[in-house]
């Protein structure tokens, strides 16, 4: 089930996952998590470092890639 809110976040997270880009995820309480995005769905992101953590999206404030990422939301939505 896709909605307008996911037309941007899904292609972005998918590009980070496919390209194995290390990310820093900041939670709303200020905690910083680091690792690679293993998978994601409508509600959670699986973040892999030494262990795999399930992080609920409602707890995420910011996702910061370690390097620039090229992603095209329009191309992903069309496929």
Curated annotation (Swiss-Prot):
Keyword NADP: no
Entries under SUPFAM superfamilies matching the protein: Sm-like ribonucleoproteins (SSF50182)
GO biological process per UniProt: regulation of DNA-templated transcription; regulation of RNA stability; regulation of translation, ncRNA-mediated
Residue intervals of the Sm domain: 10-69
Keywords associated with the record: RNA-binding, Stress response
CDD domains per record: Hfq
GO CC terms, sorted: cytosol
GO MF annotations, alphabetized: RNA binding
Xref: InterPro entries: Hfq, LSM_dom_sf, Sm
Oligomer status and interactors: Homohexamer.
NCBIfam families named among the record's database cross-references: Hfq, PRK00395.1
Family: Belongs to the Hfq family.
Chain's role: RNA chaperone that binds small regulatory RNA (sRNAs) and mRNAs to facilitate mRNA translational regulation in response to envelope stress, environmental stress and changes in metabolite concentrations. Also binds with high specificity to tRNAs.
Name of the protein this chain belongs to: RNA-binding protein Hfq
Protein species of origin: Burkholderia mallei (strain ATCC 23344)
């Amino acid at each position: 089930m896709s909605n307008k809110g996911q037309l941007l976040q899904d292609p972005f997270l998918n590009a980070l996952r496919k390209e194995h880009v290390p990310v820093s995820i900041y939670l709303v309480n200020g905690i910083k998590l680091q690792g690679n995005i293993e998978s994601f769905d409508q509600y959670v992101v699986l973040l892999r470092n030494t262990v795999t953590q399930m992080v609920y999206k409602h707890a995420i404030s910011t996702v910061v890639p370690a390097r620039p990422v090229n992603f095209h939301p329009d191309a992903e939505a069309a496929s």
